[in-house]
Protein backbone atom coordinates (compact mmCIF):
# COMPACT_ATOMS: atom_id res chain seq x y z
CA UNK A 1 0.00 0.00 0.00
CA UNK A 2 3.03 2.27 -0.24
CA UNK A 3 1.78 3.63 -3.55
CA UNK A 4 -1.58 4.76 -2.14
CA UNK A 5 -1.97 8.54 -2.09
CA UNK A 6 -4.91 10.20 -0.35
CA UNK A 7 -4.35 13.56 -2.03
CA UNK A 8 -5.78 12.18 -5.29
CA UNK A 9 -9.15 11.86 -3.55
CA UNK A 10 -8.98 15.39 -2.12
CA UNK A 11 -8.07 16.90 -5.49
CA UNK A 12 -10.83 14.89 -7.17
CA UNK A 13 -13.35 16.33 -4.72
CA UNK A 14 -12.34 19.91 -5.56
CA UNK A 15 -12.37 19.24 -9.29
CA UNK A 16 -15.76 17.55 -9.01
CA UNK A 17 -17.32 20.58 -7.34
CA UNK A 18 -15.97 22.84 -10.10
CA UNK A 19 -17.34 20.57 -12.83
CA UNK A 20 -20.85 20.47 -11.33
CA UNK A 21 -21.14 24.25 -11.15
CA UNK A 22 -19.93 24.65 -14.74
CA UNK A 23 -21.91 21.82 -16.31
CA UNK A 24 -25.26 21.56 -14.50
CA UNK A 25 -27.28 23.95 -16.73
CA UNK A 26 -26.43 21.95 -19.85
CA UNK A 27 -26.91 18.72 -17.90
CA UNK A 28 -30.49 19.79 -17.21
CA UNK A 29 -31.04 20.50 -20.92
CA UNK A 30 -29.52 17.12 -21.81
CA UNK A 31 -31.82 15.26 -19.40
CA UNK A 32 -34.92 17.05 -20.69
CA UNK A 33 -34.00 16.30 -24.32
CA UNK A 34 -33.26 12.63 -23.73
CA UNK A 35 -36.03 11.60 -21.36
CA UNK A 36 -38.67 14.24 -21.92
CA UNK A 37 -41.08 15.13 -24.68
CA UNK A 38 -42.23 18.30 -26.35
CA UNK A 39 -38.78 19.67 -27.25
CA UNK A 40 -37.95 20.01 -30.93
CA UNK A 41 -34.27 20.86 -30.56
CA UNK A 42 -31.61 21.95 -28.09
CA UNK A 43 -32.42 25.64 -28.57
CA UNK A 44 -36.14 24.91 -28.27
CA UNK A 45 -35.51 23.09 -24.99
CA UNK A 46 -33.44 25.99 -23.63
CA UNK A 47 -36.13 28.52 -24.57
CA UNK A 48 -38.90 26.36 -23.09
CA UNK A 49 -37.11 25.83 -19.78
CA UNK A 50 -36.27 29.53 -19.50
CA UNK A 51 -39.80 30.64 -20.40
CA UNK A 52 -41.50 28.26 -17.96
CA UNK A 53 -39.02 28.15 -15.09
CA UNK A 54 -36.69 31.17 -15.60
CA UNK A 55 -32.93 30.84 -15.26
CA UNK A 56 -33.36 28.88 -12.03
CA UNK A 57 -34.84 26.01 -14.03
CA UNK A 58 -31.39 25.25 -15.41
CA UNK A 59 -30.07 24.74 -11.89
CA UNK A 60 -32.94 22.55 -10.72
CA UNK A 61 -31.63 19.64 -8.68
CA UNK A 62 -28.08 21.04 -8.42
CA UNK A 63 -27.82 21.07 -4.61
CA UNK A 64 -27.73 17.29 -4.37
CA UNK A 65 -25.11 16.66 -7.11
CA UNK A 66 -23.01 19.55 -5.82
CA UNK A 67 -22.84 17.84 -2.44
CA UNK A 68 -22.56 14.30 -3.77
CA UNK A 69 -20.86 14.37 -7.18
CA UNK A 70 -17.86 16.09 -5.64
CA UNK A 71 -17.47 12.98 -3.47
CA UNK A 72 -18.23 10.78 -6.48
CA UNK A 73 -15.46 12.39 -8.55
CA UNK A 74 -13.17 12.21 -5.56
CA UNK A 75 -13.57 8.44 -5.51
CA UNK A 76 -13.33 8.05 -9.31
CA UNK A 77 -10.14 10.08 -9.63
CA UNK A 78 -8.65 8.60 -6.48
CA UNK A 79 -9.37 5.04 -7.61
CA UNK A 80 -8.10 5.68 -11.15
CA UNK A 81 -4.86 7.37 -10.07
CA UNK A 82 -4.01 4.88 -7.35
CA UNK A 83 -4.91 1.87 -9.51
CA UNK A 84 -2.83 3.17 -12.42
CA UNK A 85 0.07 3.88 -10.08
CA UNK A 86 -0.20 0.41 -8.50
CA UNK A 87 -0.26 -1.33 -11.89
CA UNK A 88 2.69 0.67 -13.16
CA UNK A 89 4.79 -0.02 -10.08
CA UNK A 90 3.80 -3.71 -10.02
CA UNK A 91 4.71 -4.11 -13.68
CA UNK A 92 8.03 -2.30 -13.37
CA UNK A 93 8.92 -3.62 -9.90
CA UNK A 94 10.71 -0.31 -9.35
CA UNK A 95 8.71 2.79 -8.36
CA UNK A 96 10.60 5.03 -10.76
CA UNK A 97 11.23 2.52 -13.54
CA UNK A 98 9.58 2.33 -16.92
CA UNK A 99 7.46 4.80 -18.87
CA UNK A 100 4.97 6.79 -16.75
CA UNK A 101 1.95 6.00 -18.93
CA UNK A 102 1.33 2.59 -20.50
CA UNK A 103 -1.92 2.00 -22.41
CA UNK A 104 -2.71 -1.32 -20.70
CA UNK A 105 -2.35 0.26 -17.25
CA UNK A 106 -4.52 3.22 -18.19
CA UNK A 107 -7.15 0.93 -19.76
CA UNK A 108 -7.48 -1.33 -16.72
CA UNK A 109 -7.43 1.59 -14.27
CA UNK A 110 -10.17 3.33 -16.29
CA UNK A 111 -12.32 0.18 -16.26
CA UNK A 112 -11.93 -0.20 -12.49
CA UNK A 113 -12.89 3.46 -12.03
CA UNK A 114 -15.94 2.93 -14.26
CA UNK A 115 -17.20 -0.03 -12.23
CA UNK A 116 -16.67 1.80 -8.93
CA UNK A 117 -18.40 4.89 -10.32
CA UNK A 118 -21.64 2.99 -10.95
CA UNK A 119 -21.84 1.56 -7.44
CA UNK A 120 -21.41 5.00 -5.93
CA UNK A 121 -22.96 7.24 -8.56
CA UNK A 122 -26.12 5.43 -9.70
CA UNK A 123 -28.31 6.67 -6.79
CA UNK A 124 -26.91 10.20 -7.18
CA UNK A 125 -27.60 10.20 -10.91
CA UNK A 126 -31.10 8.80 -10.38
CA UNK A 127 -32.11 11.50 -7.90
CA UNK A 128 -30.64 14.24 -10.10
CA UNK A 129 -32.56 12.95 -13.14
CA UNK A 130 -35.83 12.62 -11.20
CA UNK A 131 -35.54 16.20 -9.90
CA UNK A 132 -34.67 17.53 -13.35
CA UNK A 133 -37.54 15.68 -15.03
CA UNK A 134 -40.41 16.26 -12.61
CA UNK A 135 -41.58 19.52 -14.25
CA UNK A 136 -40.89 18.62 -17.89
CA UNK A 137 -43.89 18.70 -20.24
CA UNK A 138 -45.45 15.25 -20.64
CA UNK A 139 -47.49 14.54 -23.74
CA UNK A 140 -50.55 12.39 -23.06
CA UNK A 141 -50.50 10.84 -26.53
CA UNK A 142 -46.88 9.75 -26.23
CA UNK A 143 -47.15 8.25 -22.76
CA UNK A 144 -50.65 6.82 -23.10
CA UNK A 145 -51.73 8.34 -19.79
CA UNK A 146 -55.28 8.82 -18.65
CA UNK A 147 -56.21 12.53 -18.43
CA UNK A 148 -56.26 12.45 -14.61
CA UNK A 149 -52.76 10.98 -14.41
CA UNK A 150 -51.47 13.28 -17.13
CA UNK A 151 -52.67 16.28 -15.15
CA UNK A 152 -50.50 15.22 -12.24
CA UNK A 153 -47.48 15.78 -14.45
CA UNK A 154 -48.02 19.52 -14.06
CA UNK A 155 -47.18 19.35 -10.34
CA UNK A 156 -43.72 18.53 -8.96
CA UNK A 157 -43.51 14.98 -7.65
CA UNK A 158 -40.62 15.71 -5.27
CA UNK A 159 -39.99 18.54 -2.82
CA UNK A 160 -36.21 18.19 -2.90
CA UNK A 161 -33.40 15.61 -2.93
CA UNK A 162 -34.16 14.21 0.54
CA UNK A 163 -37.87 13.85 -0.25
CA UNK A 164 -36.98 12.32 -3.63
CA UNK A 165 -34.67 9.79 -1.95
CA UNK A 166 -37.29 8.88 0.66
CA UNK A 167 -40.05 8.58 -1.95
CA UNK A 168 -38.00 6.26 -4.17
CA UNK A 169 -37.05 4.02 -1.23
CA UNK A 170 -40.67 3.92 -0.01
CA UNK A 171 -42.26 3.21 -3.39
CA UNK A 172 -39.54 1.24 -5.19
CA UNK A 173 -37.36 -0.12 -2.38
CA UNK A 174 -33.59 0.18 -2.09
CA UNK A 175 -33.26 -1.51 -5.48
CA UNK A 176 -35.10 1.47 -6.95
CA UNK A 177 -32.07 3.65 -6.24
CA UNK A 178 -30.14 1.54 -8.76
CA UNK A 179 -32.71 1.74 -11.53
CA UNK A 180 -30.75 2.16 -14.76
CA UNK A 181 -27.49 1.00 -13.16
CA UNK A 182 -26.91 -1.66 -15.82
CA UNK A 183 -27.17 0.98 -18.56
CA UNK A 184 -24.89 3.23 -16.52
CA UNK A 185 -22.33 0.42 -16.31
CA UNK A 186 -22.45 -0.03 -20.09
CA UNK A 187 -21.97 3.71 -20.43
CA UNK A 188 -19.29 4.34 -17.81
CA UNK A 189 -16.82 1.48 -18.28
CA UNK A 190 -16.03 2.36 -21.92
CA UNK A 191 -16.79 6.00 -21.16
CA UNK A 192 -14.03 6.36 -18.60
CA UNK A 193 -11.60 4.59 -20.93
CA UNK A 194 -12.37 7.31 -23.48
CA UNK A 195 -12.07 9.93 -20.74
CA UNK A 196 -8.80 9.25 -18.97
CA UNK A 197 -6.79 7.77 -21.85
CA UNK A 198 -7.30 10.65 -24.32
CA UNK A 199 -6.61 13.14 -21.53
CA UNK A 200 -3.30 11.55 -20.57
CA UNK A 201 -2.01 11.22 -24.12
CA UNK A 202 -3.34 14.60 -25.29
CA UNK A 203 -1.76 16.42 -22.34
CA UNK A 204 1.53 14.61 -22.98
CA UNK A 205 1.32 15.46 -26.69
CA UNK A 206 0.54 19.15 -26.09
CA UNK A 207 3.30 19.56 -23.51
CA UNK A 208 6.77 20.37 -24.95
CA UNK A 209 9.46 17.82 -24.12
CA UNK A 210 11.49 20.43 -22.25
CA UNK A 211 8.66 20.95 -19.73
CA UNK A 212 8.49 18.83 -16.60
CA UNK A 213 4.70 18.65 -16.78
CA UNK A 214 1.65 20.04 -18.61
CA UNK A 215 0.74 23.69 -18.13
CA UNK A 216 -2.72 24.70 -16.86
CA UNK A 217 -3.61 25.66 -20.44
CA UNK A 218 -2.63 22.18 -21.67
CA UNK A 219 -4.63 20.58 -18.86
CA UNK A 220 -7.68 22.70 -19.70
CA UNK A 221 -7.50 21.90 -23.42
CA UNK A 222 -6.74 18.18 -23.02
CA UNK A 223 -9.39 17.78 -20.32
CA UNK A 224 -12.02 19.54 -22.41
CA UNK A 225 -11.27 17.49 -25.51
CA UNK A 226 -11.30 14.25 -23.51
CA UNK A 227 -14.67 15.18 -22.04
CA UNK A 228 -16.16 15.98 -25.44
CA UNK A 229 -14.91 12.66 -26.83
CA UNK A 230 -16.11 10.63 -23.86
CA UNK A 231 -19.56 12.18 -23.54
CA UNK A 232 -20.14 12.27 -27.29
CA UNK A 233 -19.46 8.55 -27.71
CA UNK A 234 -21.42 7.68 -24.55
CA UNK A 235 -24.62 9.36 -25.80
CA UNK A 236 -26.53 6.24 -27.03
CA UNK A 237 -26.28 4.44 -23.70
CA UNK A 238 -26.71 7.74 -21.85
CA UNK A 239 -30.10 8.11 -23.54
CA UNK A 240 -31.13 4.65 -22.34
CA UNK A 241 -29.87 5.35 -18.83
CA UNK A 242 -31.70 8.68 -18.62
CA UNK A 243 -34.97 7.13 -19.80
CA UNK A 244 -34.74 4.25 -17.35
CA UNK A 245 -33.97 6.59 -14.46
CA UNK A 246 -36.68 9.12 -15.37
CA UNK A 247 -39.14 6.23 -15.69
CA UNK A 248 -41.17 6.12 -12.51
CA UNK A 249 -41.69 9.83 -11.88
CA UNK A 250 -45.31 9.47 -13.01
CA UNK A 251 -45.47 6.22 -14.98
CA UNK A 252 -43.45 3.03 -15.55
CA UNK A 253 -42.82 2.28 -19.22
CA UNK A 254 -39.69 0.11 -19.39
CA UNK A 255 -38.84 -3.35 -18.03
CA UNK A 256 -35.08 -3.02 -18.53
CA UNK A 257 -32.27 -1.92 -20.85
CA UNK A 258 -33.28 -4.04 -23.84
CA UNK A 259 -36.96 -3.15 -23.50
CA UNK A 260 -36.09 0.54 -23.30
CA UNK A 261 -33.90 0.29 -26.40
CA UNK A 262 -36.58 -1.65 -28.27
CA UNK A 263 -39.44 0.72 -27.40
CA UNK A 264 -37.34 3.80 -28.11
CA UNK A 265 -36.24 2.46 -31.50
CA UNK A 266 -39.74 1.37 -32.53
CA UNK A 267 -41.32 4.71 -31.63
CA UNK A 268 -38.58 7.18 -32.58
CA UNK A 269 -36.10 5.39 -34.81
CA UNK A 270 -32.32 5.13 -34.61
CA UNK A 271 -31.86 8.88 -34.25
CA UNK A 272 -33.31 8.78 -30.73
CA UNK A 273 -30.07 7.23 -29.43
CA UNK A 274 -28.18 10.31 -30.55
CA UNK A 275 -30.58 12.77 -28.98
CA UNK A 276 -28.62 15.27 -26.95
CA UNK A 277 -25.27 14.36 -28.53
CA UNK A 278 -24.56 18.02 -29.26
CA UNK A 279 -25.37 19.02 -25.69
CA UNK A 280 -23.31 16.11 -24.38
CA UNK A 281 -20.23 17.06 -26.40
CA UNK A 282 -20.57 20.81 -25.76
CA UNK A 283 -21.30 20.22 -22.06
CA UNK A 284 -18.49 17.68 -21.81
CA UNK A 285 -15.81 20.19 -22.78
CA UNK A 286 -16.23 22.85 -20.04
CA UNK A 287 -17.20 20.29 -17.40
CA UNK A 288 -14.17 18.11 -18.00
CA UNK A 289 -11.86 21.09 -18.49
CA UNK A 290 -12.98 22.39 -15.07
CA UNK A 291 -12.71 18.90 -13.56
CA UNK A 292 -9.16 18.19 -14.71
CA UNK A 293 -7.94 21.74 -14.10
CA UNK A 294 -9.39 21.76 -10.59
CA UNK A 295 -7.92 18.32 -9.94
CA UNK A 296 -4.45 19.08 -11.26
CA UNK A 297 -4.11 22.52 -9.65
CA UNK A 298 -5.37 21.18 -6.32
CA UNK A 299 -2.93 18.29 -6.51
CA UNK A 300 -0.15 20.72 -7.32
CA UNK A 301 -1.04 22.89 -4.31
CA UNK A 302 -1.34 19.91 -1.95
CA UNK A 303 1.98 18.41 -3.02
CA UNK A 304 3.75 21.73 -3.28
CA UNK A 305 4.74 21.02 -6.89
CA UNK A 306 5.66 23.77 -9.31
CA UNK A 307 4.25 21.94 -12.33
CA UNK A 308 1.01 20.13 -12.96
CA UNK A 309 1.24 16.37 -12.62
CA UNK A 310 -0.96 14.16 -14.78
CA UNK A 311 -2.83 11.31 -13.04
UniProtKB/Swiss-Prot annotation:
GO terms for cellular component: mitochondrial inner membrane; mitochondrion. InterPro entries: Mit_carrier, Mitochondrial_Carrier, Mitochondrial_sb/sol_carrier, Mt_carrier_dom_sf. The chain crosses the membrane at residues 9-29, 61-81, 107-127, 193-213, 217-237, 277-295. Keywords: Membrane, Mitochondrion, Mitochondrion inner membrane, Repeat, Transmembrane, Transmembrane helix, Transport. Solcar repeats lie at residues 3-86, 100-205, 214-301. It is found in: Mitochondrion inner membrane. Belongs to the mitochondrial carrier (TC 2.A.29) family. PANTHER family: MITOCHONDRIAL BASIC AMINO ACIDS TRANSPORTER-RELATED, SOLUTE CARRIER FAMILY 25 MEMBER 48. This is Solute carrier family 25 member 48. It comes from Bos taurus. The lineage of its organism: Eukaryota, Metazoa, Chordata, Craniata, Vertebrata.
Amino acid sequence: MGNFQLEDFVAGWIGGAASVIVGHPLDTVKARLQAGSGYGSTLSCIRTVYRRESVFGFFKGMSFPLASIAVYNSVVFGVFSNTQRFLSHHRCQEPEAGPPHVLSDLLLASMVAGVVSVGLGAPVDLIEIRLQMQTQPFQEANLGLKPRVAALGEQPAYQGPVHCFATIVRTEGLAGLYRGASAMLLRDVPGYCLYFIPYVFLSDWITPEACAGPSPCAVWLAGGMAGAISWGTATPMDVVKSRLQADGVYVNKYRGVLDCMSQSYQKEGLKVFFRGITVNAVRGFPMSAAMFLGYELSLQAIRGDHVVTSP
